[in-house]
Amino acid sequence: TFMAGIDTFDQLSRFLKHVDRAFSGNLSAFEVMWNDYYKLVTTPPSLNQAPLPENYNYYVLVEAMGASEEQNQQALEQALEEDLIADAVIAQSETQRLQLWGLRDDVAQVFQFAPVFLFDVSLRISCMQDYVEKVNKTLQSSFPDSKNFTLGHMGDGNLHFAISVGRDDTQARKLVEAAVYEPLKDIAGSVSAEHGVGLEKKPYLHLVRSQSEIRLMKQVKH
């Protein structure tokens, strides 16, 4: 298990291919944290220590089934040589491994900024960078103080947003949902990556599913 700090999205997607190759398809985790999320979970009141400096745009937690320390070391050295990553830290013990996972899993920190809107979306990796930038730009134009804490299982194309805009009235919710869901339409994304389609996501299904697909989903549920 190790964590790497990465500067650009291009490096990040190339690094995913690199580790997938290096571990011969035995990659069990490739968890990406955007800079704002990493800062949130490594500064008080969060109790986590920052294993890497806070100046990288992306932080990725990588785990491969049955990988030896030597394999981890080799994969990282090669990635550094190829300029895919800027910095990295390898867990030397189970305690350190759990500390690294603790960062990824400390999602409750977002509630410092309650009320918070939570979203799961899925889309192709090649569209991710533009999509996240578009969502943030739209949020900023409606809510200049908005925060969007972003993380995801990049290998599966899943992203999680925890968005705070300082209020949660119906109008705010509609604006936030539109900012997240509307851009998915043009890139064949999905509005619900992991947790099924809840009631609040129903109005947006038509953006990313054809009518026949929606009918089929309804039949499957009954």
Please report, for each region that a protein language model flagged, where it lies by residue.
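Noncatalytic alpha-helical scaffold of FAD-dependent oxidoreductases
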Residues: T1-H222
